[in-house]
Amino acid sequence: MPRKRRFSMEPFGVTVESLMNEIGVTYRELGAKTGLSAGYLNHLVHGNRPVPSSEVVETLAKALGVESEHFREFRLRTITERLEAMPELIDRLYRRLGA
């Protein structure tokens, strides 16, 4: 069951590595829990691969004991997807931000 915690403001890879260190899991062990290769996880942590799909983020979050929303990029992706369905809100926000 995922722990309750504050949202991370760090980049995806930094957050994954921090959580791995916190629970004492290696790339190989996390790979076994998620079905992802240790090499791929290493690339994610070091920023050599883009942030994965929401489904992969959800899998990683569960294995690391957090909610998917813990990851900044997951929150941003969710916001973007919802905003795309509301073009009038995009325009209002844009004007309000003075952009």
Annotate each language-model stretch with its function:
Residues M1-V25:
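A short, Lys/Arg-rich alpha-helix, primarily the initiator
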Residues R28, G39, E69:
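Key DNA-contact positions within bacterial/archaeal DNA-binding proteins
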Residues M20, G31, A61:
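The alpha-helix within a helix-turn-helix
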